[in-house]
Amino acid sequence: MRNISPEELKRILENHELWLNREGGECADLSSVDLRDHILVYANLSYANLKGADLRYINLNDTNLRHTNLIDADLRYADLEEANLKYADLRNANLGGADLRYADLKEANLKYADLRRADLSYANLKSADLRGANLKESDLSNANLTYTDLSNTNLSYASLVNANLTNADSNNAKLNHANLKHAILRGANLRGADLSDVITNIYTIGYNLACPEKGSFIGYKKADNCIVELLILEDSKRSSATSVKCRCDKAKVLHIINIETDSYKEEVRSDYDENFVYRVGEIVSIDDYDNDRWNECSTGIHFFVSKQDAINYK
């Protein structure tokens, strides 16, 4: 670990500013430097090399760290509130206990980063790479996690209250004991995720089944530009993942209506298996129905509870 004087740091930052403005200078190389006793508030360190730097407890509030190399950096308990970390490389970085409230981490690489007990409330993590990261007991309340890669991530005991996980990939993530009250999970991939003792409420979007859990009900599916009206039977297995698309193992065909002409048909073939035919009055069934509800596109008769959703489906 290297040590530098305040004067040397000032010179490095001035040269970096010139480099950023294409006025000469050079890109700041602060790799493996102990920066704990230095002031970097409001500094522009975008594109700088801080690989392996010691930034523990440092105040980086509102600092520009866009595209910065922070691989293996030690940022434990650092103040990164409202910091610009868009596209930053934080692979294997230690951010345990760091304050990242309102930080912009859009498309940042946080693969295998340690974020235990970090405060990421209101942070923007859209499309960030958090594969294999440790976010145990972290605060992600109100965070933007849309399209974020959370596969194999540890989110146990994390607070995701009001977080937006739309289309996030949480494949094989640990979400045990996580608080998902008011969270949006629409389109999120939860296949293989550990959801034991997860906390939800009626306002958690995408977690509860999109279809009735018990009893018979009407469902709709699209096939060959027709809407097939189905009666999902009382004893039919049924499931949904995190969208409004559902699956069942058997259903009775009630009506088949052409979407464009409103004319009735007696039978129609499946768009995905031409040998699977829906005939009015008959019960169609699947022998190899997949009981894993989070495997949304697996085997089963796919349908929607809303007729309009079926019409809109492509």
Report the location of each language-model feature.
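Intrinsic low-complexity/IDR segments
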Residues: 1-82, 86-87, 91-92, 96-102, ...
